[in-house]
């Protein structure tokens, strides 16, 4: 359960005004606390209200190689059809490569001035308005990329649920001050309900009687974009994150001891204190003729030190548990996240194009006909097929997949071209000992020119 504290300047979370279209409605603390209050009044909620409408899974739960094998088995079983599909896949990879490389280059150029992990020489520091403006551009550029990567944004109601509900098997609880944040936003994909993949964790065997892992709702990937008033834009990606544990991913948090754990520690202190006072205190009082008030004062000081030590040790163990969890769940940060996100968007782009190509090939008339009717047919067919193959209810974007397919250049050739140098050949060309005498031979392009059509928008 999240413990929320208020700042001295009021109870409003000021959402960055430069991002109205990106962050949606203003996330005021009053609105968020109202929804949190509603969840506190519920008896043991297990998921956000209207969860099926709030979150729709859009991620295709197969890798490109797995999808190719499934499509070949069902739709391209003959050797000629298999070869044609593999050739088409190479064509899609080649065309999308240029587009997403261009997208990554633009993102890196936008992010470089505000990159907190830059290893190059320091540049002149930016003013706060300049930094906010750069962050706005980066986040606006990430919005369509996240959509193409099939991440789904988590709503404010979902965030309120995650901040209130604490799963009994989560030993670590945290405290944050919402007034310290300018904005925070979460995206997720790969919703699962089941036993989470569990790494060895500190303190997981502290008790003899420990309930087995329960089935939980978690996400295979979660992306966080948050900024504190005294910090910078934080971009992080995590794996295998439970819905009730989103608050543990935020920066500027403090570990706290739960009410149950505090009660257990207090009872332990009281029982041990009474035993100590009866067995030791009474002997000291009778043998040393010490005043009762002085003995009680010394006893209170001793118990205070013991309580501080016990609670401090407990918080240290929980902080170590939290650090251990974040170490194993973190997948990429900041600039590295941009590269990983572009690769994921390119992969989802390719898979959507392959599905559109394979399904429209078996439709009478193919892609001919009204685009709206074609995209609806494609969406329905692919969603039913994915449900049958994976058991996952995926919301497939038929309109976007059809646009990807139609944006491809018509020519399908051999990719990479036969004349494209290999890495070992490049090393040979760069060696002065093996350099050819004809300098003009080095001026030949190492690859084909960029296609005139950029795939996707």
Swiss-Prot record:
PTM annotation (Phosphoserine): residues: 316
Keyword Oxidoreductase in annotation: no
Protein name: Transmembrane protein 143
Sequence ranges of Polar residues compositional bias: 429-439
GO terms for cellular component: membrane; mitochondrion
Species of provenance: Bos taurus
Entry annotated with the keyword S-adenosyl-L-methionine: no
Region annotated Disordered, chain positions: 429-457
Superkingdom in the source lineage: Eukaryota
Main localization of the protein described in the UniProt heading: membrane
Keywords, sorted A to Z: Membrane, Phosphoprotein, Transmembrane, Transmembrane helix
Membrane topology: Multi-pass membrane protein
Location of this chain's protein in the cell: Membrane
Transmembrane annotation, as ranges: 264-284, 285-305
């Amino acid at each position: 359960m999240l413990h929320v504290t208020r700042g001295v300047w009021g109870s409003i979370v000021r959402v960055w005004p430069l991002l109205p279209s990106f962050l949606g409605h203003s996330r005021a603390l009053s609105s968020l606390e109202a929804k949190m209050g509603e969840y506190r009044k519920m008896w043991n909620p297990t998921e956000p209200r209207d969860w099926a409408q709030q979150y729709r899974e859009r991620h295709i739960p197969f890798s490109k190689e797995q999808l190719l094998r499934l499509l070949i088995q069902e739709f391209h079983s003959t050797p000629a059809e298999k070869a044609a599909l593999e050739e088409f896949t190479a064509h899609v990879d080649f065309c999308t490569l240029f587009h997403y490389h261009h997208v990554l280059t633009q993102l890196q150029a936008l992010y470089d001035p505000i990159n907190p992990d830059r290893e190059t020489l320091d540049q002149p520091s930016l003013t706060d308005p300049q930094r906010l403006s750069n962050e706005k551009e980066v986040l606006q550029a990430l919005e369509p990329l996240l959509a193409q990567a099939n991440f789904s944004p988590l709503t404010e109601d979902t965030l309120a649920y995650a901040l209130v509900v604490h799963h009994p098997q989560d030993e670590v609880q945290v405290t944050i001050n919402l007034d310290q944040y300018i904005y925070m936003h979460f995206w997720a994909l790969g919703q699962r309900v089941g036993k989470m993949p569990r790494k060895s964790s500190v303190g997981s065997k502290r008790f003899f009687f420990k309930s087995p892992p329960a089935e939980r709702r978690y996400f295979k990937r979660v992306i966080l974009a948050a900024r504190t008033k005294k910090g910078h834009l934080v971009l992080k990606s995590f794996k295998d994150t439970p819905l009730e544990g989103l608050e543990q991913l935020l920066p500027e948090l403090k570990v706290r001891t739960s009410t149950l754990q505090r009660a257990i520690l207090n009872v332990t202190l009281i029982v041990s204190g009474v035993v100590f006072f009866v067995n030791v205190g009474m002997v000291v009082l009778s043998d040393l003729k010490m005043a009762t008030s002085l003995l009680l004062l010394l006893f209170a000081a001793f118990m205070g030190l013991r309580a501080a030590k016990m609670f401090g040790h407990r918080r240290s163990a929980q902080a170590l548990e939290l650090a251990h969890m974040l170490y194993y769940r973190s997948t990429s940060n900041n600039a590295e996240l941009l590269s990983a996100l572009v690769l994921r968007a390119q992969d989802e782009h390719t898979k959507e194009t392959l599905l559109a190509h394979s399904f429209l090939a078996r439709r009478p008339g193919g892609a001919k006909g009204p685009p709206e009717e074609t995209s609806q047919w494609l969406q329905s067919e692919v969603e039913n097929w994915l449900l049958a193959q994976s058991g996952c209810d995926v919301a497939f974007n038929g309109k976007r997949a059809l646009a990807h397919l139609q944006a491809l250049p018509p020519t399908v050739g051999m990719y990479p071209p036969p004349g494209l140098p290999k890495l070992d050949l490049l090393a040979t060309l760069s060696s002065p000992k093996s350099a050819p005498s004809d300098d003009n031979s080095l001026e030949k392009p190492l690859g084909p020119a960029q296609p005139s059509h950029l795939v996707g928008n």
